[in-house]
C-alpha cells in the first residue's frame, strides 16, 4: 500500500447515555508511541473521569503490528475492541481514539457499553476530514551549488520531498520519494546531470 488516508484534523464528539457522559477524541497519531502519548494527554485533561478507553490504528490500515487498544477498567471487550473495530472500518491509518466516560450512576450492561463506545467513535469519524498520505522511501543526494536548481526543479516535477538540506562544501540532501516515481526521477536526474547526480538509498542509522 503506497498511499492511504490519514486524519487531517482532530475532532471531538460528545453524548450522554443514561446519565453517563461520553466524550470521544480522534486525532492523527503516527506510531504507537505517539498514540499512547495522545491517550496520556487526554487522561491528564480529564483526571476525574471514571474511564479513559483507547484504540489506535497507528500505522498503515493494513499493518497489524501498529494496532492497540485498552478497556481501562471497563469489562473486557466492551470498550477498546469496539472502538478499534470502528477505526478499522473507516480504512484510515495513523488514527487514535480516546473515549472519556464520566459515570452517571446507571449501569449500561456489556451490550450497552459496546454500543456506547463503538458508536461514539463511529459518530466522531463522520466529522473527520482526511487526506492522502504517500509512503516515501528515503534517499540521500550530494550536489554542488550549481546543480541545486536542477535538483529543485525535478523534485517539484516528481513531487519529491526535500526533507533536509546540509550546506557545506557541497549540499547534502535527504529526499523522500514515492515508490511510483523513484525510477523516473532517478533516470532524469542522472541524464540531465550527465551522470554526475545519483541518488543513494538512506541506510538506517545514517
UniProtKB/Swiss-Prot annotation:
Pfam families: DUF1949, UPF0029. GO terms for biological process: regulation of translational initiation. InterPro entries: EFG_III/V (IPR035647), Impact (IPR023582), Impact_N (IPR001498), Impact_N_sf (IPR036956), Impact_YigZ-like (IPR015796), Ribosomal_Su5_D2-typ_SF (IPR020568), UPF0029_Impact_C (IPR015269), UPF0029_Impact_CS (IPR020569). One of its GO terms (cellular component) is cytoplasm. One of its GO terms (molecular function) is guanyl ribonucleotide binding. Belongs to the IMPACT family. This is IMPACT family member HI_0722.
Amino acid at each position: 500500500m503506497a498511499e492511504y488516508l490519514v486524519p487531517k484534523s482532530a475532532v471531538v464528539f460528545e453524548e450522554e447515555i443514561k446519565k453517563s457522559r461520553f466524550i470521544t477524541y480522534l486525532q492523527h497519531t503516527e506510531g504507537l508511541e505517539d498514540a499512547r502519548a495522545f491517550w496520556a494527554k487526554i487522561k491528564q485533561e480529564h483526571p476525574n473521569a471514571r474511564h479513559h478507553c483507547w484504540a489506535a490504528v497507528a500505522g498503515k490500515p493494513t499493518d497489524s503490528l501498529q494496532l492497540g487498544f485498552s478497556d481501562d477498567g471497563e469489562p473486557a471487550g466492551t470498550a477498546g475492541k469496539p472502538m478499534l473495530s470502528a477505526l478499522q472500518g473507516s480504512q484510515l491509518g495513523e488514527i487514535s481514539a480516546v473515549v472519556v466516560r464520566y459515570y452517571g450512576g446507571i449501569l449500561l450492561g456489556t451490550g450497552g457499553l459496546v454500543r456506547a463506545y463503538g458508536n461514539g467513535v463511529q459518530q466522531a469519524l463522520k466529522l473527520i476530514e482526511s487526506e492522502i498520505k504517500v509512503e516515501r522511501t528515503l534517499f540521500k543526494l550530494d550536489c554542488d551549488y550549481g546543480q541545486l536548481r536542477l535538483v529543485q526543479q525535478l523534485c517539484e516535477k516528481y513531487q519529491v520531498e526535500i526533507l533536509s538540506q546540509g550546506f557545506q562544501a557541497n549540499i547534502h540532501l535527504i529526499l523522500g520519494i514515492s515508490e511510483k516515481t523513484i525510477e523516473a526521477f532517478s533516470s532524469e536526474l542522472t541524464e540531465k546531470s550527465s551522470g554526475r547526480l545519483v541518488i543513494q538509498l538512506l541506510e538506517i542509522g545514517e
